[in-house]
């Protein structure tokens, strides 16, 4: 049980054990509410759960702090967008990220990994480089549940694919003045593989430059690089 600490028992530690057991029981109950008879599950690098219109990633704790490559690209576009030079196959966002566990807030944070100058081990300039080339946080997710043996956490992913998430931001990366209609955007397909997962979403927008309502299909792939 990852919530329990080893050591000599005392009244204080017993209270901590009770709290840990309570938290673990709650997480298992929450997991059962998400992964039940109505849930469709795909096995892969992450488990992908679909319950009605909600989608979840079940991410193994062992994959925390490992490099993940996120590639977002267009898979279908309407004619008016194609005529403007925005075509199927365009990669509009590529990010190298790591998932981090913020235990205090019970959240998973996503950190964008940015390159920094290399320096020899023990070099005096190393501290300055580390402090001037930090990698920023992009977003965070509430942990909805842990699996039964607490080796993986579950996050809800619907909002990643509404076109306005920092890790799936369509229009700012293509310099188009518009925004996504979240109420008419959705996930349409998911697929889990051994070393990556793919999510296809349908985004709806009114593009001002073209004065038309446009329907776009985007594909998001996350790959484990380690």
What name fits each language-model region?
Residues 2-219:
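Auxiliary tRNA-acceptor-end handling modules of aminoacyl-tRNA synthetases
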């Amino acid at each position: 049980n990852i919530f329990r600490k080893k050591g000599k028992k005392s009244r204080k530690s017993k209270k901590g054990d009770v709290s840990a057991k309570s938290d673990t029981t709650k997480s298992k109950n929450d997991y059962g509410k998400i992964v039940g008879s109505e849930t469709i599950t795909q096995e892969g690098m992450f488990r992908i759960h679909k319950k009605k219109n909600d989608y979840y990633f079940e991410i193994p704790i062992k994959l925390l702090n490992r490099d993940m490559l996120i590639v977002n690209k267009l898979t279908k576009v309407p004619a008016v967008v194609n005529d403007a030079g925005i075509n199927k196959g365009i990669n509009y966002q590529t990010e190298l990220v790591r998932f981090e566990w913020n235990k205090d807030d019970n959240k998973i944070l996503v950190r964008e990994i940015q390159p920094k100058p290399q320096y020899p081990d023990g070099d005096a300039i190393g501290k300055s480089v580390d402090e001037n080339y930090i990698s920023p946080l992009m977003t965070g997710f509430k942990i909805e549940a842990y699996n039964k043996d607490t080796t993986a956490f579950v996050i809800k992913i619907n909002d990643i694919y509404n076109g306005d998430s920092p890790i799936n931001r369509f229009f700012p990366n293509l310099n188009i003045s518009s925004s996504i209609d979240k109420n008419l955007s959705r996930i349409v397909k998911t697929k889990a593989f051994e070393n990556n997962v793919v999510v296809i979403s349908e985004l709806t927008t009114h593009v001002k430059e073209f004065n038309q309502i446009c329907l776009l299909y985007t594909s998001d792939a996350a790959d484990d690089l380690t």
